[in-house]
Amino acid sequence: MLRTMLHAKIHRATVTRADLHYVGSITLDLDLMEAADILPGELVAVADINNGNRLETYVIAGERGSGVVGINGAAARLVHPGDLVIIMSYVQLPDAEARRHHPRVVFVDAENRIIGTGTDPAEPLPGSGLLSGHHT
């Protein structure tokens, strides 16, 4: 049996542009992609914190150090510049490996610069003021 597990999460990135007339996808700063171990062409889910919209698309590598998080194509009707998003990729693993798996979590600032990393997708960056998913 294979289990679908969170592989990587870029948490609270700021959308820098949205272009309806682009071929499609999400463009990500190459620094963010490498920190999260997300490859060009990889399937990702995008959750918009501002409006609750969720979508799936594939990744295009953006300029390293640019901070770009660009929403392209039809998704530009759902996600807008300035919105905060969570970008997630998943991996399918055999049961035994899934039980040992730890995802990569990348925290960014308002300019999409990396300010921290972790392996617990429910744990916020210390000092961020966000609540842990472990507490109810």
From Swiss-Prot:
Signal peptide: none annotated. The active site is at 25 (schiff-base intermediate with substrate), 58 (proton donor). Pathway: Cofactor biosynthesis; (R)-pantothenate biosynthesis; beta-alanine from L-aspartate: step 1/1. GO terms for molecular function: aspartate 1-decarboxylase activity. It catalyses: L-aspartate + H(+) = beta-alanine + CO2. It is found in: Cytoplasm. It comes from the Bacteria. Is synthesized initially as an inactive proenzyme, which is activated by self-cleavage at a specific serine bond to produce a beta-subunit with a hydroxyl group at its C-terminus and an alpha-subunit with a pyruvoyl group at its N-terminus. The modification Pyruvic acid (Ser) is found at residue 25. It is an enzyme of class 4 (lyase). Pfam families: Asp_decarbox (PF02261). Its cofactor is pyruvate. Its EC number is 4.1.1.11. Catalyzes the pyruvoyl-dependent decarboxylation of aspartate to produce beta-alanine. This is Aspartate 1-decarboxylase. It comes from Acidothermus cellulolyticus (strain ATCC 43068 / DSM 8971 / 11B). The lineage of its organism: Bacteria, Bacillati, Actinomycetota, Actinomycetes, Acidothermales. The gene is panD.
